[in-house]
């Protein structure tokens, strides 16, 4: 009979594999704890377990195999409550110090399939080894789990606990991969956010100049020509200032309320009548008539004769520009020589209805129109009375090195 039961065990295990139980691992752990305690109590008495196993419903007959496979929980609960030693799982038999274990208890119930799936030949081999090592120290439940999991093939780990462990390990690997990707992305953004380090460029702050260095900049731009151009532009100013110191007569062109002169008038300065200052006779500060015959000019009236005096510095760069032919013009497009020298300076051009001279340029010193300026012949006393510069103060600016 025992041999017949042993032969029928593979069928039982195959049916158990086809119908795995759906029991919680937590309930199984509680059952194992009760089972281990139940085995430790009767260990002192060597009472045989055969009469109990005959009454146990866990050893199925061939006719009861499909019923037990579908309802493992119904048979398990009464067996634990009535006979606690009737559930001889493989792990519990290892923990108990029983010397003689019958072969009838080698049949694995359906609830043990959650932890391990073994064939009938493996169970026989392990039973023999358990009988030989019955006097040795029993293994712990955790060590048995580890040894069994190493010996089993991968396809036998079909329990819910193994699936949970596999799922947790996969999730951890995925999270680690995402963390590594995030670190790589942050490194790439850090490198792209600093293109200056990749290209070797350096950023330097820009500060405004503490003092203007126009003369030095002009020298660097024009080099040797700078001194000649400046001397030509201001030579008349220098000569007029030195002549005023010698004679005591300061001739200037300015707006009436100004304390400084926009231009100093010298011998090469031109009058509105078209003649130079040296062609006029200075009688008093209010009488400077023209000496040229048939000229009706009774008072010298300054008019710019160079494009630099009206701020048109670019005209000299033109190839067809003639400095001697340049004349200041009115808004009527006629020059000052085509207007009357006296009075409001009406236009004398045939067909022009211009009643007075209105300049189409501005003063390079004050940005005001020509008609807003006047020509003054001042003595040293009148300059002192008006608080305007006199003596060497008028030439102090020209002694600075260029």
Swiss-Prot record:
Biased composition (Basic and acidic residues): 1-35
Coiled coil: none
Compositionally biased spans, kind Polar residues: 77-90, 393-402
Region named Disordered: 1-205, 378-402
Annotated family: Belongs to the FAM221 family.
Protein's recorded name: Protein FAM221B
Species name: Homo sapiens
Gene: FAM221B
């Amino acid at each position: 009979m025992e041999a017949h039961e042993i032969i029928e065990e593979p069928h039982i295990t195959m049916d158990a594999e086809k119908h795995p139980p759906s029991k919680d691992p937590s309930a199984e752990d509680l059952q194992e704890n009760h089972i281990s305690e139940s085995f430790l109590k009767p260990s002192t008495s060597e009472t045989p377990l055969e009469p109990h196993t005959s009454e146990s419903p866990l050893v199925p007959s061939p006719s009861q195999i499909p019923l037990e496979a579908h309802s493992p929980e119904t048979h398990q609960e009464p067996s634990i409550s009535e006979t606690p030693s009737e559930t001889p799982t493989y792990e519990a038999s290892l923990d108990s110090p029983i010397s003689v274990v019958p072969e009838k208890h080698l049949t694995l119930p359906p609830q043990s399939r959650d932890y391990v799936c073994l064939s009938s030949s493996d169970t026989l081999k392990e039973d023999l080894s358990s009988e030989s090592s019955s006097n040795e120290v029993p293994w712990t439940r955790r060590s048995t789990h580890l040894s069994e999991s190493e010996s089993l093939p991968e396809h036998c780990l079909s329990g819910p606990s193994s699936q949970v462990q596999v799922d947790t390990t996969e999730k951890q690997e995925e999270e680690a991969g995402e963390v590594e990707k995030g670190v790589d992305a942050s490194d790439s953004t850090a490198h792209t956010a600093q293109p200056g380090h990749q290209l070797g460029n350096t950023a330097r702050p820009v500060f405004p100049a503490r003092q203007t260095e126009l003369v030095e900049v002009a020298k660097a731009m024009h080099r040797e020509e700078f001194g000649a151009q400046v001397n030509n532009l201001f030579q008349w100013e220098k000569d007029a200032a030195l002549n005023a110191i010698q004679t005591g007569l300061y001739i200037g062109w300015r707006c009436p309320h100004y304390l400084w002169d926009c231009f100093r008038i010298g011998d090469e300065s031109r009058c509105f009548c078209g003649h130079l200052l040296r062609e006029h006779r200075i009688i008093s500060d209010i009488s400077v008539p023209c000496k040229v015959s048939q000229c009706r000019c009774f008072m010298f009236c300054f008019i710019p004769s160079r494009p630099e005096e009206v701020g048109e510095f670019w005209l000299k760069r033109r190839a067809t520009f003639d400095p001697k032919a340049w004349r200041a013009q009115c808004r009527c497009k006629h020059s000052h020589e085509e207007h009357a020298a006296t009075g409001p300076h009406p236009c004398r051009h045939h067909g022009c209805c211009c009643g007075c001279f209105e300049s189409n340029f501005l003063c390079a010193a004050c940005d005001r129109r020509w008609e807003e300026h006047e020509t003054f012949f001042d003595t040293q006393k009148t300059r002192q009375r008006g608080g305007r510069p006199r003596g060497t103060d008028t030439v102090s600016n020209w002694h600075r090195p260029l």
